[in-house]
C-alpha cells in the first residue's frame, strides 16, 4: 500500500515526546535519518530514545496514558469497522445469488485485500505508533511489510481490472461480454495477486541476502531497498500515479460513452412516439411506411441518411415449419414505397443479461405481411403489390395450407441524388432463425414463377402493426434497463475510485515532496498519511452499500440476522410449489 519506507513512526504528538529527548531537535529530518548525541541513539524514524544496547527508556513512546487510550480506541474502531464491513461483503456474496456476477467477483477480491489490511496491517501499525519502536523482531517486520505491500498493491491491481472491465463492457458490449465469464474473471483476479506478490514479497524478504547485510536498525521496521528517496519516488510513480492516471482516463471514457448511449436512447424513444402516428393503416387498403428504426449502434451514427427500418415484435414459431430451401430474388425499386404496399416484420432478439450469462445469442424470426392492394407482377421497376399474401404454388397442399419460410433481404443505399435501391425477395413470407448457425442454401427463382395467394384481412394487418409498436417499446425498455445497470456499475466504480484517490493522494504527495525537500514534512503528517491509506479499506464496503441496492439490502439482512427467515421463506415457497405440482399431476393423468 505505502510506497515509502515504514520507518516514519514518530510519536503522534511530537511536542510531548520532545521532553524525553535532550539536545538539538531532529524535526525536519528525512525519514530514516539517524543522529547521534553522545552515548544515545536518537532515531528520527522511530522517535524513541535508546541506549547503545537497544533498551528503550520510554515504554509509551513519549505519549501520555490518555493519548495512548485515544489512539488505541480510534484506530481500534477503524480496524473493527474495516473487518466487519469486508466480512459482510464476502458473506453477502456467498448467501445472495444475485450478487454472484462477474463484476462482483472483482469486488470480492478487493474485499479480501481490504480484510487482510484490517486484520493485520492496521493493528501492527497502531502498535508501532504507540510504542515508537518495533518490538516483534526482524522476521515479523519483514512478514508484516510483505503482507501489507502485497495486499495494498493487489487493491490497486483490482481497481485497474475493474476499470478495464467496465470500459470494455460499455464500449464493446457484443465482443467483450461474450468472453466475460466467471472463469476469465478468476484468471484476472489471480494474475492481480500473483503480480503483486512477485513485485514485493521476494524483494522485501530477501533483499538483505542479495546485498549481504541488513541495514535496518534494531527497533525499526521499514523496507530496506526503499531507504533512498529517489527509489521511493520511482515506486510512487509506477505503483500509484500511473494506475490513477489510467483509471481516471478510463472512467472519463466510460462517462462519455454512457452519456452518448443516453442520448441515443432518448432519440430511440422519440422515434417510437412518432411511429405511433406514422403507422396508421387506412381502411382503403393503403398504409404509410414503417418509420425508421435501427437497433444497432453503428446505424445510429448515420443521421444524415434516410433509414427505412423494420417494425419489430415478438413471434412464436410453434405453428411454423421451416423448409430446407430459401428462395431469393433481387429486384430494384424506385426511390419510394408504393402507396398500396406496407411491410411489417417481426423480430425476436433474445440476448442474455450481461451479469448472468457470458455469451449472447440472437434469434430472429421475421414475417412480412402485405396489406390489401392491387395485385401486380413483380418486376424490376416496382415493388410487389398484391391484395393477398403470396406463397409458392408448390407449397400448397391439397388437404391444407402450410406456410413455408423464405428469405427477405432488404438492402438500401443512398446516392448523391438522394435516391436509394432495395432488393426484395419474390416471396413476402419470411421466417429466418439465427439461433443455430447453420446456413441454408439459397436457390434463385425466376420472375415469372407461378404463385398462389392467401387472403389477408385488414384486421390482421392492423394487429401486426400493433404488435410491432408494442415490441418497439419493449426493446426500448430493455435498452433502458441495460443502460441503468451500466450507470449503477459506473457509479460504484466512480465511488471506489474517488475514495482511493482521496485516501492515497496525501501520502504520495508527501513522498514526492520529500524527494526534493527532506525537511518540509512534519513527522506527524507521515503517520496520518500512512494511516489514511489504510482507511481506504474501511471506506470501500460503504461505497458498495451506497451504490448497490442489492448489497445494501443483503447487509441489512445480515446485520439484523434475517438469514434464517429468508431461508424459511424460500423453503416454504418451494414446498407450496411442490404441492401445486403434485395436485396438477393427477388432473393431467385423467
Swiss-Prot record:
Residue list for modification Phosphoserine: 385
SMART domains: 7TM_GPCR_Srsx (SM01381)
Assigned keywords, A-Z: Cell membrane, Disulfide bond, Endoplasmic reticulum, G-protein coupled receptor, Glycoprotein, Membrane, Phosphoprotein, Postsynaptic cell membrane, Receptor, Synapse, Transducer, Transmembrane, Transmembrane helix
InterPro entries in UniProt: GPCR_Rhodpsn, GPCR_Rhodpsn_7TM, Musac_Ach_M3_rcpt, Musac_Ach_rcpt
Record: glycosylation sites: 6-7, 15, 41, 48, 53
Example GO biological process: positive regulation of smooth muscle contraction
Pfam families noted in UniProt: 7tm_1
Entry's family note: Belongs to the G-protein coupled receptor 1 family. Muscarinic acetylcholine receptor subfamily. CHRM3 sub-subfamily.
Protein name: Muscarinic acetylcholine receptor M3
Species of the source: Bos taurus (Bovine)
Gene: CHRM3
Amino acid at each position: 500500500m505505502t510506497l515509502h519506507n515504514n520507518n516514519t513512526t514518530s510519536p503522534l504528538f511530537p511536542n510531548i515526546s520532545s521532553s524525553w529527548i535532550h539536545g538539538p531537535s531532529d524535526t525536519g529530518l528525512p525519514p530514516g535519518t539517524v543522529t547521534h548525541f553522545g552515548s544515545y541513539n536518537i532515531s528520527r524514524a522511530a522517535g524513541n530514545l535508546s541506549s547503545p544496547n537497544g533498551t528503550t527508556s520510554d515504554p509509551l513512546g513519549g505519549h501520555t496514558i490518555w493519548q495512548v487510550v485515544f489512539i488505541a480506541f480510534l484506530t481500534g474502531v477503524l480496524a473493527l469497522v474495516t473487518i466487519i464491513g469486508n466480512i459482510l461483503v464476502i458473506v453477502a456474496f456467498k448467501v445472495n445469488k444475485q450478487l454472484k456476477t462477474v463484476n462482483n467477483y472483482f469486488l470480492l477480491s478487493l474485499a479480501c485485500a481490504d480484510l487482510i489490511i484490517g486484520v493485520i496491517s492496521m493493528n501492527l501499525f497502531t502498535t508501532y505508533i504507540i510504542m515508537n519502536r518495533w518490538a516483534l523482531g526482524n522476521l515479523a517486520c519483514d512478514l508484516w511489510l510483505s503482507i501489507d505491500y502485497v495486499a495494498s498493491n493487489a487493491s490497486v491491481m483490482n481497481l485497474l481490472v475493474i476499470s478495464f472491465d467496465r470500459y470494455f463492457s460499455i464500449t464493446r458490449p457484443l465482443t467483450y461480454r461474450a468472453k466475460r465469464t466467471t472463469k476469465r474473471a478468476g484468471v484476472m483476479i489471480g494474475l492481480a495477486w500473483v503480480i503483486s506478490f512477485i513485485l514485493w514479497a521476494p524483494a522485501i524478504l530477501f533483499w538483505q541476502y542479495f546485498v549481504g547485510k541488513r541495514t535496518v536498525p534494531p527497533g525499526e521496521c521499514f523496507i530496506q531497498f526503499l531507504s533512498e528517496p529517489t527509489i521511493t519516488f520511482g515506486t510512487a510513480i509506477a505503483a500509484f500515479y500511473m494506475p490513477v492516471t489510467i483509471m481516471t482516463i478510463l472512467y472519463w471514457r466510460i462517462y462519455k460513452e454512457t452519456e452518448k448511449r443516453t442520448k441515443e436512447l432518448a432519440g430511440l424513444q422519440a422515434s417510437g412516439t412518432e411511429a405511433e402516428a406514422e403507422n396508421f393503416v387506412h381502411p382503403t387498403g393503403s398504409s404509410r411506411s414503417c418509420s425508421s428504426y435501427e437497433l444497432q449502434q453503428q446505424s445510429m451514427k448515420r443521421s444524415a441518411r434516410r433509414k427505412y427500418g423494420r417494425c419489430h415484435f415478438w413471434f412464436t414459431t410453434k405453428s411454423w415449419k421451416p423448409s430446407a430451401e430459401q428462395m431469393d430474388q433481387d429486384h430494384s425499386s424506385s426511390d419510394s414505397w408504393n402507396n398500396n404496399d406496407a411491410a411489417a416484420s417481426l423480430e425476436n432478439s433474445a440476448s442474455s443479461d450481461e451479469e448472468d450469462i457470458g455469451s449472447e445469442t440472437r434469434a430472429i424470426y421475421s414475417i412480412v405481411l402485405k396489406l390489401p392492394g392491387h395485385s401486380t407482377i413483380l418486376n424490376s421497376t416496382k415493388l410487389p403489390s398484391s391484395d393477398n399474401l403470396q406463397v409458392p404454388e408448390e407449397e400448397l397442399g391439397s388437404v391444407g395450407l402450410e406456410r413455408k419460410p423464405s428469405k427477405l433481404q432488404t438492402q438500401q443505399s443512398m446516392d448523391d441524388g438522394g435516391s436509394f435501391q432495395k432488393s426484395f425477395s419474390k416471396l413476402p413470407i419470411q421466417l429466418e432463425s439465427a439461433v443455430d448457425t447453420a446456413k441454408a442454401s439459397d436457390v434463385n427463382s425466376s420472375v415469372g414463377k407461378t404463385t398462389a395467394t392467401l387472403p389477408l384481412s385488414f384486421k390482421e394487418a392492423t394487429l401486426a402493426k400493433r404488435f410491432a409498436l408494442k415490441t418497439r417499446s419493449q426493446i426500448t425498455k430493455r435498452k433502458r434497463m441495460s443502460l441503468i445497470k451500466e450507470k449503477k456499475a459506473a457509479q460504484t466504480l466512480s465511488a471506489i475510485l474517488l475514495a482511493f484517490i482521496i485516501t492515497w493522494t496525501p501520502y504520495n504527495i508527501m513522498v514526492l515532496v520529500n524527494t526534493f525537500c527532506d525537511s518540509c514534512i512534519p513527522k506527524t503528517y507521515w503517520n496520518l498519511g500512512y494511516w489514511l491509506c489504510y482507511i481506504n479499506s474501511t471506506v470501500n464496503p460503504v461505497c458498495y452499500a451506497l451504490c448497490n441496492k442489492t448489497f445494501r439490502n443483503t447487509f441489512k439482512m445480515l446485520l439484523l440476522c434475517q438469514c434464517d427467515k429468508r431461508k424459511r421463506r424460500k423453503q416454504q415457497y418451494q414446498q407450496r410449489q411442490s404441492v401445486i405440482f403434485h395436485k396438477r399431476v393427477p388432473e393431467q393423468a385423467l
